[in-house]
Amino acid sequence: MLLTAEFWVAVAFVAFLVIVWRVGGFSMMTSGLDSRAKRVRHELDEARRLREEAAAVLADYKRRRTEAEREAEAIVAGAREDAERIAAEGHARLNDFVARRTKAAEAKIAQAEAQASAQVRAAAADAAVKVSETLLRERLQGGAAQDLVRASLGDVKSRLQA
């Protein structure tokens, strides 16, 4: 057993471990592992902090986006209301304009009708006077007839024009 290679490898390994332990190698390894564990823990804490910060930024972004969408909807609704109000005002103005134009046209037509009616009456009165004058001249002779015709024609003419 003392002459086998495995025995001497085991003895060398145990001797190596004793030397490492005496020199403080184990404490160096544990301190190295502890510092590595601290560094990993620190990196995990940093990653957790960054993740929370990113989540806060994402929540803020979502909140701002919803606010912007609400504001855009409010702007669109306001613009739609303004457009409807302006269209209604335009229709009202157009209807008022058409009503005024119609009323003015009707007034002009009524005035033209009244003027035409007056002209027709005047023409009818003149024609009636001339016809009456012609008939009376043919049937009546003398100065008295002339005076009677003139008085009657003036009376008829004034009544027809009134």
From Swiss-Prot:
The chain crosses the membrane at residues 1-21. Keywords: ATP synthesis, Cell inner membrane, Cell membrane, CF(0), Hydrogen ion transport, Ion transport, Membrane, Transmembrane, Transmembrane helix, Transport. It is found in: Cell inner membrane. CDD domains: ATP-synt_Fo_b. One of its GO terms (molecular function) is proton-transporting ATPase activity, rotational mechanism. HAMAP family: ATP_synth_b_bprime. Belongs to the ATPase B chain family. This is ATP synthase subunit b 1. It comes from Methylorubrum populi (strain ATCC BAA-705 / NCIMB 13946 / BJ001). The lineage of its organism: Bacteria, Pseudomonadati, Pseudomonadota, Alphaproteobacteria, Hyphomicrobiales. The gene is atpF1.
